[in-house]
A protein has these predicted regions:
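Surface/interface-facing alpha-helical segments and adjacent flexible terminal/loop regions used
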Residues: 1-225
């Protein structure tokens, strides 16, 4: 019984780790800005990495001096700063400074022209996610190999491994790749996340102009390093 409780607590910590990563790397919203401006992001990142035994130094999300204004005004100012930076980094005109798509990184590694959606790695990710019950939200056209979506998948699989019930439309544990949530998690972590996210985190740290994205890069790098 003790081992089961310990295992569940580790899986819960992993789920929290990937939840924070997903929040940090999708398009910035008020929830993220409030957490980063108020110090909650820094606190959560430190606690999660400590719980997982990952000794990493993550810089302050709002910079060394913090936000100039406390409370909602500080969060609003941070959100206004993060959104154009996220667009520059992850969308770009014409090219992003740091593509958030696994398929683009795989194509770059292979020396071929990356094509969103139709490249082999992106299609492989989409098949894996659908086999886990995670599909593209209705009305959206976002490729499923986006870094935040991959973090969300790992969060869901970790929650399942911790004992959470399957969400609507998701297979039972035996129906997941590898026959269990833990096996599916390890397969996706080693075969996908760890194959490209370390390099993504390194480039993000180098390209980021806002301290939050340098912090997010250090945090993600600790998770996949």
């Amino acid at each position: 019984m003790g081992n089961e409780v310990a295992d569940a607590s580790v899986w819960q910590a992993r789920a929290a780790a990937w939840e924070l990563a997903a929040l940090s790397l999708r398009y910035p919203d008020a929830e993220l800005a409030e957490a980063a401006a108020g110090g909650e992001w820094d606190e959560a990142a430190g606690e999660i990495l400590a719980a997982l035994g990952l000794p990493a130094e993550v810089p302050a999300a709002a910079g060394e001096g913090g936000c100039d204004t406390a409370g909602p005004a500080g969060a609003d100012a941070l959100l206004r700063a993060l959104r154009p930076e996220a667009t520059r980094l992850f969308v770009g005109a014409p090219e992003p400074a740091c593509s958030p798509y696994e398929g683009v990184w795989a194509a770059e590694a292979d020396g071929v022209q990356p094509l969103l959606f139709v490249n082999p790695r992106s299609m492989e990710v989409e098949r894996f996610m659908r086999s886990c019950g995670l599909g593209r939200p209705e009305g959206t056209n976002e490729p499923l190999d986006h870094v935040a979506t991959e973090c969300e998948l790992l969060e869901r699989l970790a929650l399942r491994a911790a004992g959470a019930p399957a969400s609507e439309g998701a297979p039972d544990g035996a129906g997941l790749p590898g026959g269990s949530p833990a096996a599916a998690y390890e397969t996706f972590l080693s075969g996908h996340a760890q194959a490209w996210m370390p390099a993504f985190a390194e480039r993000l740290a180098a390209e980021a102009r806002h301290p939050f994205y340098r912090a997010a890069a250090a945090y993600l790098g600790a998770l996949v390093g």
